[in-house]
Amino acid sequence: MSTTDKIVYLNGNTLKIEDLINIGYRGYNVSITQEVEELIQKGRNVIDDILKSEKTVYGINTGFGLFSDVIIPPDQVKMLQVNLIRSHSSGVGTPLTPERTRMLLALRINVLTKGYSGITLETVKRAIKILNGNCLPLVPEKGTVGASGDLAPLSHLALGMMGEGKMYDFGDSGNTFTSNLDVDVLEYRNFKFSPANEILKRQNLTPIELNAKEGLALINGTQLITSLGAEAVYRCKVLAETANIITAMTFEALKGLTAAYHPLIHAARPHSGQGRVAAFLRSVLHSDQYPSEITLANKDTKKVQDSYTLRCVPQVHGIVFDTIDFVQGIINTEMNSATDNPMVFDTDELCGTISGGNFHGEYPAKALDYLTIGIHELSNISERRLERLVNSQLSDGLPSFLVNGGGLNSGFMIAHCTSAALVSENKVLVHPSSADTISTSSAKEDHVSMGGWSARKCLNVVENVENVLAIELLAACQGLDFRRPLKTTEPLEAVYQLVRSKVTFMDKDRFIQPDIEEVYKLIRSGQVLNVVNSILNKK
């Protein structure tokens, strides 16, 4: 894969999470090289040879699942593929967003470029034009059991490309839309849907016409799990870094002790993530380079150690970083894996097909369940830090609920309740979906991954964590205001100023939800992380 002038060149081997985010959220188009075209054609030649030989091969001239022993006559092999897509388009629920639909389609194209699916080059080229033209099928998010692949959502994707079902209708915008990863992330977008054939015609595009094996090639794979998982990993990486910054803000508001972050402590327990978090906290808290007036004024404190929610942050946040790194490796591999069945080979050892189980979603399912558990812990500990900010018995001099005139004003009282509610919700959502399996297809497909729900609930938890951390950051800035005129370090002052550019000090009760939303946007868009990095990178 290479990226040039907002074009991602797909080859089935080197696509990265950032590339997929660029395609989904930043409007990058996709293309393939002549070398990839030749690889796709090589795989298709194997299928054409099988058709000429009149051999019986699963998925080419047989039924599917329980009907795999039913032989399909040559004049019906194309209808077999059309029927497959129509019957398998059985999903329900909220449609995937335009961004996630783009990621889903791009990822499916990427695995097809490996040449193991036997799809025609013409179909791949049409799929690329459909993606680049933002002709995005309506894909319900529910309905996959994660083996044999994400059949229902990928069937809806294929159905739209066939000119059936519905597609997003962006009206007079030239079939473009404003993405919501980086700007106005909570802006309501009232998209409508129109018949797929009308959208394709409007863009002067021709629907895909399925040949033998092609319906199966378009739907047999883990691309829903993996594309949603890629977004989850991307957001978790930003979120984990931002959580360290927010922790430091709270640390300063609570007049924490930096001794617990001493490098000798973390060298004695050399987990990668733990050392990484401790080093970061040392880089933004009081130092010769970045002095903190709050820390200097507190140097004669009689306190000898902080609570666990401050003292043990490297140990708690650290494993989250290691979890993200592990899951990223699984997702990157899955993004570039052939997940079709049967798979097509043209080698010295074999020229033909082999039936296998690469479509089984257990790898990304288990990984994303693990990621969900890991990223949730950031909200668990954040809510406890928030309790210390709003509880005057724990906050070293801050007013109850971070507001003057308590009684008449309630301050952050119910913002803390919101945080607690989200954390409680997460504690249910972290139950691993992949611990379950239900036999399907008359016990032919008798073990499944349930990875679709693993991916979707991971994103649900990520959003909850983003909001919990937004509330903590808002409260930490309020706490720092009560420490004025003393200031914190330069990197943390930059975060404070960023927040205050959107949300003013709460001198009395006001409608607080818009404040939370503004800070949520700063976190989700990466602005909090960027403002700190811009200072640290000057060193």
From Swiss-Prot:
EC number assigned by the record: 4.3.1.3
Disulfide bond positions: none
Induction comment from the UniProt entry of this chain: Up-regulated by phagocytic stimuli.
InterPro entries for this protein: Aromatic_Lyase (IPR001106), Fumarase/histidase_N (IPR024083), HutH (IPR005921), L-Aspartase-like (IPR008948), Phe/His_NH3-lyase_AS (IPR022313)
UniProt entry tagged with the keyword Electron transport: no
5-imidazolinone (Ala-Gly), cross-linked positions: 147-149
PTM sites of type 2,3-didehydroalanine (Ser): 148
Catalytic activity: L-histidine = trans-urocanate + NH4(+)
Top-rank taxon: Eukaryota
Pathway assignment: Amino-acid degradation; L-histidine degradation into L-glutamate; N-formimidoyl-L-glutamate from L-histidine: step 1/3
Post-translational modification: Contains an active site 4-methylidene-imidazol-5-one (MIO), which is formed autocatalytically by cyclization and dehydration of residues Ala-Ser-Gly.
Keywords: Cytoplasm, Histidine metabolism, Lyase
GO cellular component: cytoplasm
Gene Ontology molecular function, alphabetical: ammonia-lyase activity; histidine ammonia-lyase activity
A GO BP annotation: L-histidine catabolic process to glutamate and formate
Ranges annotated as spanning the membrane: none
Parts forming coiled coils: none
Pfam families membership: Lyase_aromatic
Localization per Swiss-Prot or TrEMBL: Cytoplasm
Family: Belongs to the PAL/histidase family.
Name of protein: Probable histidine ammonia-lyase
